[in-house]
Amino acid sequence: MKPLEITVQAAGTAEELCSNIRSALSRGLPELALAPIKHDGNIVLVASGWSMPDYIDEIKAHRRAGRPIVAVKAAHDFLVENGVNPDLWINLDPRDRTNGIQRLNDHTVYMPASRCPPSTFDYLQGRKVLLWHSWAEGPEMTAIGGGKLAVGGGTTSGLRAVNIGYLLGFRNFTLYGYDSCNRADGVKRFTGDKAGVSIDVFVGGPTGRKFNCNMAMAQQANEFQKLFDVMGDITVDARGPGLIAEIMRVRNERKAA
């Protein structure tokens, strides 16, 4: 599929991000490191797309099967409210997103990136927190310093969660709420938030299925396709009727042809 020509503005200035990183490092938190984990190779990533609540029964079935459940940002509180305390919570965003983790619990390991704001770490005091660093070109790497594992990947928390899962040894990913598009009524998240400026995106060429996305969603869809260039041994089951699920459907169809 032809990549879109998109320009997006990343959140946070270089000065803000470096300040956040230095603040996080000063806290002496344990950091994400490569480690073997006992599992069956499957991991479940739950993001905040509008279709996610429709699949809560499937998510609960994964929990009963003993598969790790990862909440991406605001998906945390929905899962907790529905009886699924996530095993991990992952956030890359340098903006304060603590409004999505109001139902903190003692089971979840909270994994904010070092570029997240100090307010996030202050809020998580007393909880199980595992620090990780996101790779980025420029001064952020200087702020992180040498000898640190930095996780590369796309520009969203959801895509970095895939890379973290890969580093931890998982190869089979089930995705919920990775719609990366607006619902027909303009809703972009399960919380009912509406999208701003949007564009139409076609999967499989101009005669393919059309999706409406904001720029960040379209960029995420582009970056998602690059996962397979660097992690060719993964399998992805993207659940729901969204853009990323359609990309996977077309990809699998072409692969089988």
For the regions a protein language model found, what residue spans apply to each?
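Metal-ion/cofactor- or nucleotide/acyl-coenzyme-handling active-site neighborhoods
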Residues: 1-257
